[in-house]
Amino acid sequence: MSVLNITTCPYCNRQYITHYNDEKGNERSTADLDHFYQKSIYPLFALSLFNFIPSCQICNSRMKGTKQQNTLYPYEEGFGDRVKFCLKPKDHNEKNLLKSWLGDSEAINNLQIDFEFCENLDKEFKKRAEGSIKLFRLKQVYDIHKAKALDILLKQRIYLEGSYKEYMSTLMKELSLSCTDEDIIDILVGYHWKDGSYDEPLSKLARDIFYK
């Protein structure tokens, strides 16, 4: 599985997938192997490499199990920029979001993680994306990460204010280090998402919230 170079669960982007060798030199992995197409229904795909999806145990065993649903096939498509995480007030009261930005801890209970779909989205893709969100209960499991999303929003405000970016650029020059705007964002936010890859848990959430 290591040749697939998958470092986080492709279904949820919440758990690391680690490959290692045991004492006997056998390759092991922390991932479960999900049969994208259930072998009981599609026996011809049972041993197909392209039907094996390394995923976390929660997504594979607890969420999906033997359920067969129209979802995104990770090797070919993901949410990308077509489906993005967002943070919304449950009662559509924008004041709750503002209170959270100002540090009101009680206001976070009135917020929820949701998804936004880009306009003119292909209907079949949208169905598969909605199927993935429903099957893996992404709204529910990401609810615990609301505080992280708010933290990203705060860091976005710090970056857009301008002085942090200027300070970091000056510091890097003094250290004779090259630093792009993207590098500065990486340092501030603590996530790396160059080339559209999400190699760290929650990096998709972080990118979507930061560039909201």
Give the ranges of each region predicted by the language model.
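C-terminal, charged low-complexity interaction regions
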Residues: A107-K212
